[in-house]
């Protein structure tokens, strides 16, 4: 099964040529190039491949958050896509987006263990952006939950909490994160 990543949320139609307002969910607008294949589906469609409809990007104006798809050329057709999600395959995203040293795709971080001083605190189940800060939503390990700690807690993606991300070891080492868990 193809893994799909949410790129943005489609807003209202704009203009007479089928333009769509795009509320970007990605840190990589450079992926939205002419000729790139994307899919549109309801936002809850991650697991239902049959609900994805493929389109080709005609153009994207980042400054105006305007997306044009090749086969959508009227306001009426554009309105049919309002409030849907714009998705791209994980493979396509990784091919088009060049990461700098220390940058990661969200999809690579989900599932990693969160470790502090050789103690596993839990695993990342989701990443949320609140204001301008990314947060790891961490499901606490059962042995810590049994000690009365929270089942789920948030860790800001900041140097104060995140020491190192080791994809090859499938873990994120932290400092000060256990204090967040204890106070959750």
From Swiss-Prot:
Chain ranges passing through the membrane: none
Keywords: Chaperone, Cytoplasm, Ribosome biogenesis, rRNA processing
Domain of life: Bacteria
Disulfide bonds: none
Pfam families in alphabetical order: PRC (PF05239), RimM (PF01782)
GO molecular function: ribosome binding
Signal sequence annotation: none
SUPFAM superfamilies associated with the record: PRC-barrel domain, Translation proteins
Any one biological process term the GO annotation gives: maturation of SSU-rRNA
Gene3D superfamilies in UniProt: PRC-barrel domain, RimM
GO cellular component: cytosol; ribosome
Every PRC barrel domain range: 101-180
Family: Belongs to the RimM family.
Domain notes: The PRC barrel domain binds ribosomal protein uS19.
Assembly behavior: Binds ribosomal protein uS19.
Full protein name: Ribosome maturation factor RimM
């Amino acid at each position: 099964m193809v893994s799909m990543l949410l790129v943005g949320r489609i807003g209202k139609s704009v203009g007479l040529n089928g333009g769509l307002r795009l509320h970007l969910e990605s840190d990589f607008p450079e992926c939205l190039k002419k000729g790139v294949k994307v899919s549109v589906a309801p936002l809850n469609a991650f697991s239902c491949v049959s609900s994805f409809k493929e389109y080709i990007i005609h153009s994207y104006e980042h400054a105006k958050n305007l997306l044009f798809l090749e086969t959508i050329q009227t306001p009426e057709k554009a309105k049919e896509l309002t409030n849907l999600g714009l998705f791209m395959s994980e493979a396509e995203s990784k091919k088009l987006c060049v990461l700098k040293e220390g940058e990661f795709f969200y999809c690579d971080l989900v599932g990693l263990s969160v470790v502090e001083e050789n103690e596993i605190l839990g695993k990342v189940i989701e990443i949320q952006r609140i204001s301008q800060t990314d947060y790891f939503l961490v499901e606490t390990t059962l042995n810590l939950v049994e000690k009365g700690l929270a089942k789920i807690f948030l860790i800001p993606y900041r140097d104060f909490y995140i020491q190192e991300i080791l994809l090859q070891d499938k873990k994120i080492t932290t400092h000060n994160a256990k204090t967040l868990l204890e106070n959750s």
